[in-house]
């Protein structure tokens, strides 16, 4: 959106990679997903990836992007993933999304009507880690005036 007062770049899709599909012992299907996104919301993905190539980003080793991991959970009666999405955000701070061995409890109940996406938020689980290098990189907390 042009003129966003927060300084965010126009919304564009993240780069998405679908990973391993696993069937758990109770028939539950899990699918791994990785999303590449800009570290700095003022940049579009192409600009952030150019920073990766040039080593000029605000992340560790000049990275301009980070990867966010999510695991999709499908009930055994929805192996093709036709149900609508429900996104689960783990409480924090610093915890990865749950890694169920079988469907039960709240997750089992939700999976009766939805595919559930268990997100490892930035810096947790299998997403790009938040480290001292990430948090102390030059420009990691740049103000809008400094851009």
Regions found by a protein language model. Name each.
Residues 9-12, 20-147:
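Gly/Pro-rich cap/lid or specificity-loop segments adjacent to the active site
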């Amino acid at each position: 959106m042009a003129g966003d007062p927060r300084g965010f770049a126009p919304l564009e899709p993240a780069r998405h990679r679908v990973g391993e599909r696993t069937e758990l012992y109770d028939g539950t299907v899990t699918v791994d997903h990785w999303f590449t996104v800009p570290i700095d919301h003022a940049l579009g993905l192409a600009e952030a990836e150019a920073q990766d190539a040039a080593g000029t980003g605000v992340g560790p080793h000049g990275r301009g992007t980070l990867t966010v991991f999510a695991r999709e959970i499908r009930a055994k009666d929805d192996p093709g993933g036709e149900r609508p999405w429900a996104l689960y955000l783990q409480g924090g701070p610093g915890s990865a999304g749950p890694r169920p061995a079988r469907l039960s409890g709240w997750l089992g109940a939700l999976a009766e009507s939805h595919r559930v996406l268990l997100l490892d938020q930035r810096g947790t689980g299998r997403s790009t880690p938040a480290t001292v290098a990430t948090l102390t990189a030059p420009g990691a907390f740049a103000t809008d005036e400094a851009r």
